[in-house]
């Protein structure tokens, strides 16, 4: 399945280690997904009927709905940490509003759970990482 890749504005990107589908490691450019690509990847792997976009507390968020609970997926791309770090180091950059949003959800919408999801993509290989909220 092909997902939309974000076009890089900065042509000074540094190559870093990438994981191929067969688990081989190559050195190449990151291939972060667009916000819509993230949404489509989540829908593809979690089920079209289970994943939707909703406005909750004035924020447009992705919601995973299983039969037990609604989980807000605050998802961002995993990319290279940048120079001067080793080429295997990756990161996820979480916007400041994520923490405020989580605190507001706990107070105002306790029926929801919130997850920080990192999405790594390279040549069709997708890896999802569920981060621990308490570390944010």
Residue ranges and their predicted role:
Residues 1-136:
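Intrinsically disordered, charged low-complexity linkers and terminal tails
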